[in-house]
């Protein structure tokens, strides 16, 4: 066995399918069928890394591995990769002996040998001897062990090597040989000599093509975190590198190394080595082509053909030739019908950074002049481009006007983050423009209000509050009168929005400030004539009083706001007031009245097309249904709210975020976990903002309950945001405590639960019902430890654990008592967890009481499917301990059915453990293949992939079948297994031992 290439460190990510195809190639070679693969991809995308992994695995399988690389030497050194491979492998006795009998190959070795010189390969006889010698060598080696021949970088191969690859691919048939060649697709221009060779080889039945696409963002991020370990990468920094690298592993690693070493001045610079590498391809081209590339780099990520032509200064014929050269060498790629993009964004960055300062300014000024034409400003996004070019060319008035226009365009497109950025830029330029109000068409106060509103709609509430505080202060100064301070309606709007956003910060000080600001806003605005601004200020004041728990005053002012809105003819403000009244009714226990009010508010807001109020109404309406156990109705309302939020770009806005979370929670609670998983999969893992971290924290509910491997990855990404939003940390730490409990790590359970409880106490209202769940999780860990101590006769430890359990029970009881305050509602789920605290305390005391667990079951009710199953597991255990085996078996059976249906693998493992210990339920160790006996071999293959979490399209790709065929197989499998879903089928596969790893989906 020969191992020429060094095995790379670490696990490959993002290349499972490609690796699987190449390993299948090794299987074919090992069984006596000669095969070949052409592995292609851009430079740096991971071809060598993939091939290194294949060679490592081939060596482990007993293959003789020969590996060589081409060099950028043209035809001056024939057979260079073959010589490289043979020189490395000649240390092996078997290879050396096989070479000694083939003098034609001798000259390829360092010590030389008999046979033709390298230069004489042009004669037909010498070529035949060389080709025949290689073929014979491979055949002889393959007789002893399978052979893997790897020839890398064939885009640099000499003509003789290209011909040899074609010859071997055609002549090898039944030899145990696999040939893998790699080449760069970005170097393969139309006249490249390898291009016809690839086309010819791809027609051969024994040759497969493996094209490496760029890594997807998640895979690239995972790869970079592994490369950086044990160092930690800032989430924003990592996201920036992943975005800039566009899936190219080498580029990403270079950016990461420069970032970790502090060599990057900012996120717009490139490491010197990487920049030089990228520019080396540009410097080989004609001067005209380089000028076109410079103009295209300044034009932006997508370069309009006419813009680039005009900016380049070239004549039409010269320009066309230059563009053709750039496209032929795959530096530019046609985009649509009227423009180009760089093959890779970092290439554009390198070309742009290489521009001289004056050259860069002049090109940007040219772009400004060209884009300022009104006809060119028609397509969406053009104003943003113009603003960028104006700034870069120091045209401040032009940049200001374009920024305002770009903000309006972004608003119309439902892109609040971009709108805020443009408006913020305009605000920064305001004092540098001669007549800003005339240029912008609005007062500074209105521009600031637009910026703040879009900041909030993109999820950045804190920045919106900061902007509005400054703006409100500005308008109260003499200079502020010119900024819009004389406009009482504008002042009212700014005060009202500031109060509203302050309440969303969920902080006692912020709420107190909100009440003060809202009260002052209502008092400063004239009641007559009736205006929607004044009516909305009243409605927001009512909402602030509600947040402060001043319920009587809140209802009074909400009714005033409703009357003022009617007088002003503002139905959407009426809806806003109705939402507050609905929340009040719900907190006062009048649930039917609350739902009626909230339904009316939701309808009015939707008819008025005011999305912010509509989403607020949708959230509270769905929550009211959820709290009284109407999960299906709550899910329906939340689903519609989620659709509206995402369709309009308000997914991270106030209530857009909350309604998404509620939509997920409804399906998680009612047992529709495949739907819940789909929603959770849409919650980003690679989070870069607090709102995204909030959603990712919510996804932990199902990831923990299903035992998904995403738990660890989500934790790594959301952890930096725990200090930004304490609530996110509270949710995550509580769920991580449950994850540790399922894994049997009670130390970690107690540590995480303690932090979650502390974070709940730090909430604005102190002791609250949020403490119940983490307290009960910790109580369960204490009960486990007490039981273990009693089993070993350690009475002192058992007593200590019981005392600690008592403290946790008291925390849960205090949380429930606090819920009696009007602000909180302890619905069926809350009562269920409180009852669980009592049952777990009984277990900690050594009395696992079936009646206590039955009380938990009754409290949750049938709507909470998963919690019911978890409770049935404990009830079955208690019944078994009490000797009531038949009842225990029935509870166990129901819980096991639910666990399989949901794909709740940790619960299923706990149930299987109980079945073995208590000998209840149908034994889960089925006879070998008993349940799967009805499946064909192909269906078993498909089921393995289902259990691995693969989609129908992915299954089709792995098994080389059509997606429609994969769909038919999946349907047949579900029918034969009696499974209601893919998740249930995956659980069966795992239980039956067909899958060694549970599905992540």
Segment roles from a protein language model:
Residues 916, 923-980, 984-987, 991-1001:
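Helix-turn-helix DNA-binding segment
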Residues 45, 84, 215, 219-421, ...:
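Short secondary-structure boundary elements
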Residues 36, 50-54, 250, 302, ...:
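Extended alpha-helical scaffolding segments used for macromolecular assembly and cargo binding
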Residues 59, 235, 270, 382, ...:
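Internal alpha-solenoid helical repeat scaffolds
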Residues 38, 44, 183, 261, ...:
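Tandem amphipathic alpha-helical repeat scaffolds
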Residues 126-129, 173-240, 244, 254, ...:
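Alpha-helical sensor/transducer elements of the RecA-like P-loop NTPase core
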């Amino acid at each position: 066995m020969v191992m020429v290439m060094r095995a790379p460190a670490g696990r490959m990510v993002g290349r499972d399918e490609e690796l699987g195809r190449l390993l299948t190639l090794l299987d074919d070679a090992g069984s006596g069928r000669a095969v070949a693969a052409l592995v292609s991809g851009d430079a740096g995308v991971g071809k060598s890394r993939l091939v290194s992994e294949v060679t490592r695995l081939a060596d482990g399988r007993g293959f003789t591995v020969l590996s060589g690389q081409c060099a950028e030497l043209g035809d001056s050194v024939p057979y260079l990769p073959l010589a490289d491979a043979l020189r490395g492998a000649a240390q092996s006795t078997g290879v050396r002996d096989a070479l000694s009998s083939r003098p034609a190959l001798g000259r390829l070795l360092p010590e030389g040998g008999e046979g033709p010189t390298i230069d004489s390969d042009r004669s037909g006889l010498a070529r035949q001897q060389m080709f025949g010698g290689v073929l014979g060598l491979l055949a002889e080696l393959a007789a002893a062990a399978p052979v893997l021949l790897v020839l890398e970088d064939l885009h640099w191969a000499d003509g003789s090597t290209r011909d040899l690859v074609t010859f071997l691919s055609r002549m090898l048939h039944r030899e145990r040989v696999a040939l893998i060649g790699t080449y760069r697709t970005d170097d393969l221009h139309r006249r490249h000599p390898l291009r016809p060779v690839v086309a010819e080889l791809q027609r051969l039945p024994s040759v497969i093509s493996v094209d490496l696409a760029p890594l997807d963002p998640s895979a690239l991020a995972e790869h970079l975190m592994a490369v950086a370990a044990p160092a930690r990468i800032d989430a924003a920094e990592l996201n920036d590198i992943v975005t800039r690298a566009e899936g190219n592993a080498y580029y990403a690693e270079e950016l990461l190394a420069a970032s970790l070493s502090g060599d990057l001045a900012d996120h717009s610079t490139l490491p010197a080595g990487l920049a030089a590498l990228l520019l080396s391809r540009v410097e080989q081209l004609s001067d005209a082509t380089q000028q076109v590339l410079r103009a295209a780099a300044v034009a932006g990520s997508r370069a309009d053909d006419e813009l680039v032509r005009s900016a380049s200064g070239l004549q039409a014929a010269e320009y066309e030739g230059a563009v053709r050269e750039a496209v032929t060498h795959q530096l530019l790629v046609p985009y649509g019908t009227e423009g180009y993009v760089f093959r890779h964004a970092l290439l554009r960055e390198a070309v742009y950074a290489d521009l001289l300062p004056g050259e860069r300014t002049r090109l940007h000024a040219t772009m400004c002049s060209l884009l300022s034409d009104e006809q060119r400003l028609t397509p969406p996004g053009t104003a943003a481009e113009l603003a960028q070019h104006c700034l870069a060319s120091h045209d401040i008035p032009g940049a200001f006007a374009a920024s305002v226009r770009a903000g309006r365009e972004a608003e119309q497109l439902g892109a609040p983050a971009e709108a805020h950025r443009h408006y913020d830029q305009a605000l920064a330029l305001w004092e540098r423009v001669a007549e800003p109000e005339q240029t912008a068409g609005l007062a500074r106060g209105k521009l600031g209000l637009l910026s703040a509103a879009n900041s909030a709609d993109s999820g950045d509430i804190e920045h919106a509050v900061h902007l509005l505080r400054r703006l409100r202060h500005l308008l109260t100064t003499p200079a502020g009168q010119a900024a819009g301070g004389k406009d009482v309606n504008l002042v009212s709007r700014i005060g009202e929005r500031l109060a509203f956003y302050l309440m969303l910060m969920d902080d006692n000080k912020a709420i107190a400030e909100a009440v003060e600001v809202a009260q002052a806003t209502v008092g400063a605005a004239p009641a007559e004539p009736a205006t929607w601004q004044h009516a909305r200020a009243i409605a927001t004041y009512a909402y602030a009083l509600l947040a402060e728990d001043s319920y009587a005053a809140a209802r009074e002012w909400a009714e005033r706001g409703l009357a003022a809105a009617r007088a002003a003819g503002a139905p959407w403000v009426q809806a806003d007031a109705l939402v507050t009244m609905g929340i009040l009714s719900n907190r006062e226990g009048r649930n039917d009245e609350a739902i009626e009010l909230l339904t009316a508010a939701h309808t009015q807001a939707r008819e008025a097309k005011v999305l912010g109020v509509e989403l607020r109404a949708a959230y509270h309406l769905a929550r009211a249904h959820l709290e009284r156990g109407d999960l299906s109705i709550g899910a329906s309302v939340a689903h519609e709210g989620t659709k509206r939020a995402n369709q309009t770009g308000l997914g991270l806005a106030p209530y857009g975020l909350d309604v998404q979370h509620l939509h997920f929670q409804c399906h998680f609670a009612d047992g529709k976990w495949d739907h819940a998983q789909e929603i959770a999969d849409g919650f980003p893992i690679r989070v870069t903002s607090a709102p995204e971290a909030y959603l990712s924290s919510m996804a932990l509910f199902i990831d923990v309950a299903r035992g998904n491997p995403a738990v660890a990855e989500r934790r790594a990404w959301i952890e930096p945001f725990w200090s930004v939003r304490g609530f996110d940390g509270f949710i995550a730490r509580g769920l991580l405590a449950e994850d540790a409990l399922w894994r049997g790590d009670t130390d970690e359970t107690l540590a995480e639960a303690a932090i979650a409880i502390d974070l709940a106490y730090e909430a604005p209202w102190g002791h609250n019902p949020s403490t119940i769940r983490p307290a009960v999780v910790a109580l369960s860990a204490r009960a486990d430890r007490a039981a273990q101590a009693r089993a070993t006769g350690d009475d002192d430890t058992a007593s200590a654990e019981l005392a600690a359990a008592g403290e946790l029970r008291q925390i849960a009881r205090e949380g429930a008592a606090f819920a009696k305050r009007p602000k909180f509602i302890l619905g069926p789920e809350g009562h269920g967890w409180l009852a669980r605290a009592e049952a777990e305390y009984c277990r900690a005391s050594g009395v696992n009481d079936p009646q206590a667990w039955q009380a938990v079951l009754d409290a949750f009710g049938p709507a909470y499917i998963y919690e019911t199953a978890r409770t049935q597991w404990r009830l079955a255990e208690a019944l078994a301990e009490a000797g009531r085996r038949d009842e225990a078996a029935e509870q166990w059976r129901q819980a096991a059915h639910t666990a399989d249906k949901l794909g709740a693998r940790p619960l299923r493992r706990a149930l299987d453990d109980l079945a073995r210990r208590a000998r209840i339920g149908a034994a889960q160790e089925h006879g070998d293949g008993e349940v799967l006996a009805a499946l064909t071999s192909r269906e078993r293959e498909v089921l393995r992939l289902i259990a691995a979490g693969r989609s129908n399209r992915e299954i089709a790709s792995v098994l080389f079948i059509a997606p429609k065929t994969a769909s038919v197989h999946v349907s047949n499998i579900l029918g034969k297994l009696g499974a209601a879903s893919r998740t249930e089928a995956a659980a069966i596969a795992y239980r039956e031992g067909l899958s060694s790893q549970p599905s992540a989906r």
